[in-house]
């Protein structure tokens, strides 16, 4: 008796591929109809899957939104890291930090206005991806300040943790989609002014 082994090819798409397909379709659907107004049933009909099949991969609509949010935040983080790597000094890094967040945030979160629902929900409800993103920005600020103090670009009298917390508070309107929404038209100019303000306060 010959046993037939089922290969990945005969089983069809992998779970990972199907998850990616659901996320891609969801992002397109949310961009047209909004995250808040869309139900899992709506999404299932648009993809051609059953509602139960989608629940096999995601426990809720929020889980799908979290993946989309995490992908967007990863894009911003990658752009930010690339910009910082090209900046020769801590002073330039501060400028790039503010400017890159303003530009990337506007492009990714508001290129499709209805995707703002996801960004807003992630910030308002403290989704894990949003919390992790905030933590990473705080670490970036701290690293820049350390480098600036070591190079004697920045003052060293104020405790480092206090300075980092203050800089992040100034940065937050550009990093938080709920706040960024109110200044889309002036975000780049605002970023330059805020960076200049921070640099004046950091001067030795």
Briefly describe each language-model feature range.
Residues 15, 23, 65, 69, ...:
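Amphipathic, non-transmembrane alpha-helical scaffold segments
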Residues 67, 71, 81-107, 160-167:
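Hydrophobic alpha-helical connector segments
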Residues 100-142, 150:
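Short secondary-structure transition hinges
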Residues 25-29, 100, 104, 170:
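Short amphipathic alpha-helical elements of helix-turn-helix/winged-helix folds
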Residues 91-92, 128-134, 150-166, 185-189, ...:
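All-alpha amphipathic helical-bundle segments outside canonical DNA-binding/catalytic cores
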């Amino acid at each position: 008796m010959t046993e037939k082994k089922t290969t990945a090819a005969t089983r069809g798409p992998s779970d990972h591929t199907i998850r990616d397909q659901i996320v891609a379709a969801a992002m397109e659907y949310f961009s047209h109809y909004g995250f808040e107004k869309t139900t899992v049933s709506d999404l299932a009909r648009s993809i051609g899957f059953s509602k139960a099949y989608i629940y096999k991969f995601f426990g809720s609509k929020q889980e799908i939104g979290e993946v989309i949010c995490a992908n967007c935040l990863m894009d911003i983080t990658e752009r930010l890291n690339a910009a910082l790597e090209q900046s020769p000094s801590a002073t330039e890094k501060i400028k790039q930090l503010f400017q890159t967040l303003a530009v990337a945030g506007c492009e990714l979160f508001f290129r499709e206005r209805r995707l703002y629902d996801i960004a807003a929900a992630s910030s308002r409800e403290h989704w894990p991806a949003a919390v992790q993103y905030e933590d990473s920005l705080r670490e970036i600020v701290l690293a820049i300040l350390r480098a600036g103090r070591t190079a004697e670009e920045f003052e060293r009298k104020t405790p480092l943790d206090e300075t980092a917390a203050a800089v992040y508070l100034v940065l937050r309107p550009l990093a938080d989609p709920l706040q960024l929404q109110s200044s889309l038209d002036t975000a780049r100019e605002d970023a330059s002014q805020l960076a200049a303000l921070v640099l004046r306060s950091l001067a030795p």
